[in-house]
Structures are given as C-alpha cells and as structure tokens.
Amino acid sequence: MTDNNYRSPQSAQQLIAASAQPVTLFSLSWCSYCHAAKQLLKQLNVPFRVVELDTGEYREPVLNQRLRKELQQMTGSNTLPQVFIGTESVGGYTDTQAALKNGRLKKLLEAFEITLPAGLNR
C-alpha cells in the first residue's frame, strides 16, 4: 500500500539546484533516447548528473509521479530524457542535439566555463 502523504525532501528543482554538476539529466535506465543523451554529453566532455527515475528511491510510485509531473510543468513535455543546464531546460535528446547545432548549448555551457571540443563549437 502506498502512503499518499509520502514526501521526499527533494523536488526536481531541488535536485537540479543541489547537483554538483552544471548539467542534470532526468532519465530512465532502459530508454534509448536517454542513453543517447548521456552518450552525447559524454562525447562533448560535459560533466553531468543523471537522475534515473526508475531506480533507487525514485522508483517509489508517489515520488516518481510527483517528479514526472513537476518536470512536465517545468518543461512542457512529459517525455524523458530532460536535460537542464543550471536551472534552464534544454529539453530532450533531439532538443539537445538541436541546441548543439544552433549554438544554444555552447552559450549555456559557457556560463559554467565549459568549452565544447574543437570542431563542435558554433
């Protein structure tokens, strides 16, 4: 039986703010787009924190639903992954790819003194 009064000390916004990394990626461990987003960030040498919403404490149904609902309110999307640079939503994997191509990713990362590898800067 699930306790509907269950309250985690952390919301999605708190998880982002408390991250030691400038980039936070909300993910599902089995999701191919989530895996692709992780690979893209690794290839770009971007430090990031992954919050897997289907593992550990985040599997608890009430907490999971609350975090997913909050992410949807923050981003306007109910899909994963969701990438944040600082507190700014970049979006999902295809949005992150587009941000790389149009220079938005570079601009957001520069605020954290992160430089993309040569040849990928726009």
Residue positions per predicted region:
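Thiol-based oxidoreductase modules, predominantly thioredoxin-like and allied folds used
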Residues: P47-R68
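Eukaryote-biased feature marking scaffold/signaling PDZ-domain proteins and nuclear chromatin regulators
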Residues: A18-Q21, F26, V62, R66, ...
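Local sequence-structure signature of Cys/Sec-based thiol-disulfide redox active-site neighborhoods
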Residues: R7-L53
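Alpha-helical interaction elements in eukaryotic regulators
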Residues: S8, W30-Y33, A37, L63, ...
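Thiol/disulfide oxidoreductase modules built on the thioredoxin-like
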Residues: L71-T79
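Non-catalytic, surface beta->alpha helical segment in thiol-disulfide oxidoreductase systems
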Residues: I85-L120
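N-terminal organelle transit peptides
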Residues: M1-P9, R122
